Amino acid sequence: MALLVPGGGCARLGVSLPAQVSKRRTVIAALPRPERETVDWVDATSSFFQNDSRPIMLYDGVCNLCNGGVKFVRDNDRNRRIRYEALQSEAGRKLLRRSGRDPDDISSVVLVEQDRSHIKSDAVLRIMEYIDLPFPQLAFFLQFVPQFIRDFAYENIASNRYMMFGRSDSCELYDN
């Protein structure tokens, strides 16, 4: 066992056990019980799909690239198969929780369907499947690119999106 000592070094700590060791456990501290009940975010957000089963695209509302992406999807979705919600909105934060993500995490586009959620390149491919030709066919071929390569490209663009495309002063919201 090592022990950190002042000055940045380490010291070796030797521990000798008696010949007979009892396996008795003593509780030193217990975690407090949560004051609130655990929230089932799927149930809490089921109203989003009660009257409208279309998937919801969650996007960064202050990102110029993301807003351009939403406009592109809207222009190529003549049948209005996708709804839109900014990640920063209250509904967006709830849907992030439903997807098992941190409500403050705006690092990825998320496509929330009734029974599952998609992030990063999987979300982009799934969105492409919903919009007009030729994008579903393009998504079909892109799925053969290994996910780690697709996500690597996605993450590099996403982490530099403000620097490359800028940021807007206000969060853009779109009507569904």
Please describe what each predicted stretch is:
Residues 1-23, 29:
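N-terminal chloroplast transit peptides
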Residues 24-47:
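Short, charged low-complexity linear segments at domain edges
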Residues 44-76:
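Local sequence-structure signature of Cys/Sec-based thiol-disulfide redox active-site neighborhoods
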Residues 53, 60, 81, 105-106:
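A structure-centric signal for secondary-structure junctions around beta-strands
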Residues 59, 85-86, 143:
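Active-site-adjacent beta-strand anchor residues
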Residues 74-85:
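Conserved helix-turn-beta segment immediately C-terminal to the redox Cys motif
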Residues 90-176:
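Thiol/selenol-based redox catalytic cores and closely related redox-interacting motifs
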